[in-house]
Structures are given as C-alpha cells and as structure tokens.
C-alpha cells in the first residue's frame, strides 16, 4: 500500500449501531493485513465474498473484531441502500468519516480524507506528476473525488448519472 488510513476505535460503536438499527444491513471489516471480518452477513455479503474469493472470519459482535480497521463495507439489497445512506448521514458522529456508495448494494465507511481523490493526489505528488497530467476513469459515487481532482476525467457511458453530470468528465 502507498499509505493506509484507519478508522478510529470509536467507529466500532458506530458500526454496531448501524447493524442494530438496520437488520437488513451487513458489514465487512477490512484490516491492513487483508484480513476481513463479516458481521451479520446477508446474501449481498455472500455474493461479494464469492466474487472476491476473500478469506473471511464471520463474527457475532464488533467486540470480536480486532483493530485497526481500514474500511467498513456495508452491504444491503439495492432497494434498502437509500435508507442505509440516510441513516449513516443522519448520525451526529458520522461527519468524521467518508461515507460513499461503491455500488448499488455496497456503502463504504472510511476515515475522513481516505478517498480515491486524496490517494491519487498523494501518488501524483510522490511521483512528481502535475495534476493536469493525471487521467482517471471512474463510474460510481466512490470515484467522484478522484474525477474531481484529476486533470483529465473520463467515465463510461453506463456510469452513474451524477458521475456523467460532472462538468469535467468526458464520456467514453
């Protein structure tokens, strides 16, 4: 990894609160050594883990999840995602985190500033590449910070409408 940002330990309480309030949601918890812990797995979780072939430890409580956590990936059926996002964004402590949908059924919770835009900027700085010479391609909400920062931004025709609506994005 170029760098890694971890969720503060208080995030465990926040994650447990989401799982308790929204029983249709599950969460995968990612660690810096690529370990994954899954809490309250649902069909979306199982499909995601099957696609990624990621070894996962299934747990019954956040107390079983070691720290540090680099990302919490909530999963729910697409029709429930708006309720999940609304719940997350309405919590008073959640302004301390990045909350973004990465697909129609997945929502990422990461440390504030831990997003694709920040990482592309940091990589460009380390490599001495000027912003106007950085090209990025993205199609979903978790790509918006990266596309906003890039000197040249592109998206496929089937990208989310809010991605295609970005003024600097060129449609592929």
Which stretches of residues belong to each language-model region?
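A short acidic, helix-capping loop that chelates divalent metal ions and anchors anionic groups
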Residues: 1, 106-108, 163-164
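Generic low-polarity alpha-helical segments
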Residues: 7, 15, 46-47, 168-171
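Acidic, Mg2+-coordinating phosphoryl-transfer loop and its flanking beta/alpha structural elements
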Residues: 120, 130-172
């Amino acid at each position: 990894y170029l760098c890694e940002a971890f969720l503060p330990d208080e995030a465990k309480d926040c994650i447990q609160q989401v799982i308790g309030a929204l029983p249709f949601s599950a969460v995968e918890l990612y660690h810096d050594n690529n370990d994954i812990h899954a809490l309250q797995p649902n069909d979306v979780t199982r499909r995601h883990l099957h696609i990624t072939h990621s070894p996962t430890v299934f747990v019954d409580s956040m107390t079983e999840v070691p720290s540090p956590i680099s990302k919490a990936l909530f999963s729910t059926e697409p029709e429930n995602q708006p309720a999940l996002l609304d719940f997350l964004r309405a919590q008073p402590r959640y302004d301390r985190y990045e909350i973004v949908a990465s697909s129609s059924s997945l929502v990422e919770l990461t440390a504030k500033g831990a997003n694709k835009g920040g990482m592309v900027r940091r990589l460009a700085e380390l490599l001495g590449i000027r912003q106007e010479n950085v090209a990025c391609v993205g199609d979903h909400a978790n790509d918006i910070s990266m596309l906003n920062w890039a000197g040249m931004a592109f998206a496929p025709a089937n990208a989310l409408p809010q991605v295609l609506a970005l003024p600097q994005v060129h449609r592929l």
